[in-house]
Amino acid sequence: MATVDIEKVLETCLLAGKIMLESDAEMYRVEDTMSRIALASGDYRLVSYVTQTGLFVGLDGTSTIRMVQILNRSINLEKVSNINQLSREYVMGDYTLDELLTKLKELEQERKFFPLWLRFISAAVVSGTIMILFGGVWSDLFLTCLIGGLGYILYYSSLKVLRIKFLSEFLAAFFIGCAALLSSQLGLGINQDMIIIGCVMPLVPGVQMTNALRDLLAGHYLSGVSRGTEAMMTASMIGFAIAFVFQLFY
């Protein structure tokens, strides 16, 4: 295979890994996807080093190494699924390397996010159902849905302005705590504890915790510890905010 083809193989693998990392995919999945693409491109063995903030790839037997920095990360499981599907189709011979690279570039440019109103409804449904599951009363359902939805919208909106994830989580949890306690004191809510528990659930880093454990079990200790630390920081910000609210009200 010519040098230009080797460069294109590396570019394709690097782009696939970059999109997956930015979409918060597990490290083992990123490495496996890139390895399969390289293997299907000419029986190459890919050598990679993957972290949450950087990606290094090379082909065994060559001197070329490529790297990319990961600056922005968000949960986008749809992109992860799309890249998995594209890699499977490429391995089966449905696409050429050029076609796969083109489709990956198109996927990278996609900015498909759920509209704000749908995010509000989703957060509201999660908040309300969790509140009921944890033993809350049905009369608090509407209030929990409303506060939970508004709290998540505050988190999402403040993140765009502040660009600091942990501060946005603190502000959202602080709003949830204040709204729940005020509603309870005004007689609008009955069980303030269950309302708060339900409302903060959309902020809880469940995906990060799961991926951290999966990376640790797969032997990716660096990424597993860093993901776990990030999840613990998020949980701490939520806890600090609620504790601060209780300190203010009582």
PLM segments and residue spans:
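Core alpha-helical transmembrane segments of integral membrane proteins
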Residues: 112-186
